[in-house]
Amino acid sequence: MTNYLYILALQIAEAESEGGLFDFNATLPLMAVQILLFMVILNAVFYNPVAKVLDEREEYIRKNLTQASDILAKAEAITKQYEKDLAQERREAQLIISVAQKEAQDIVALEIKQAQKDTELLVNEATSQLNSQKQKALSALEDQVNTLTEQIKSKLLSNQLIS
């Protein structure tokens, strides 16, 4: 049994001396070649297509951002031009409104003056008609007064002659 333990200890010592953390035999360069081959395959199959897609996407985004910036600049320029045109149109409309108001005020003033003249003419005409009628009435009254005075006079005289 002691021999058996001795043989087991020798086998364990032999196993430890053969394989350690790094074995410098043909396996190490083979593993290095496998890693390099794996890296080349991954680069060709995975990394290059992914990098290409990422580059295309970046270019697409950059292109869209540039187009959006151009469109935004054009929209802002158009907006400024429309605002400028709108301000000019408002000024012109305000000028037209003020001219129309002045013309309307002038027309109203003329119509008021004409109405005042017409009213004055009507008043003068009515006054002259009233004065004319007054003169006629006074003349008629004077004639009647004269007639009545003549009648009274003749009655008085006839009464005096009779008495």
UniProtKB/Swiss-Prot annotation:
Chief place where the protein resides: plastid
Topological relation to the membrane, as annotated: Single-pass membrane protein
Transmembrane segments: 26-46
UniProt entry tagged with the keyword Calcium: no
Subcellular localization: Plastid, Chloroplast thylakoid membrane
Keyword terms of this UniProt record: ATP synthesis, ATP-binding, CF(0), Chloroplast, Hydrogen ion transport, Ion transport, Membrane, Nucleotide-binding, Plastid, Thylakoid, Transmembrane, Transmembrane helix, Transport
A GO cellular component annotation in the UniProt record: chloroplast thylakoid membrane
Alphabetized GO MF terms: ATP binding; proton-transporting ATP synthase activity, rotational mechanism; proton-transporting ATPase activity, rotational mechanism
Coiled-coil regions listed in the entry: none
Pfam families linked to this entry: ATP-synt_B (PF00430)
Family to which this protein belongs: Belongs to the ATPase B chain family.
Record note on quaternary structure: F-type ATPases have 2 components, F(1) - the catalytic core - and F(0) - the membrane proton channel. F(1) has five subunits: alpha(3), beta(3), gamma(1), delta(1), epsilon(1). F(0) has four main subunits: a(1), b(1), b'(1) and c(10-14). The alpha and beta chains form an alternating ring which encloses part of the gamma chain. F(1) is attached to F(0) by a central stalk formed by the gamma and epsilon chains, while a peripheral stalk is formed by the delta, b and b' chains.
Note: In plastids the F-type ATPase is also known as CF(1)CF(0).
NCBIfam families per UniProt: PRK07353.1
PANTHER family per UniProt: ATP SYNTHASE SUBUNIT B', CHLOROPLASTIC (PTHR33445:SF2)
Function: F(1)F(0) ATP synthase produces ATP from ADP in the presence of a proton or sodium gradient. F-type ATPases consist of two structural domains, F(1) containing the extramembraneous catalytic core and F(0) containing the membrane proton channel, linked together by a central stalk and a peripheral stalk. During catalysis, ATP synthesis in the catalytic domain of F(1) is coupled via a rotary mechanism of the central stalk subunits to proton translocation.
Designated name of the protein: ATP synthase subunit b', chloroplastic
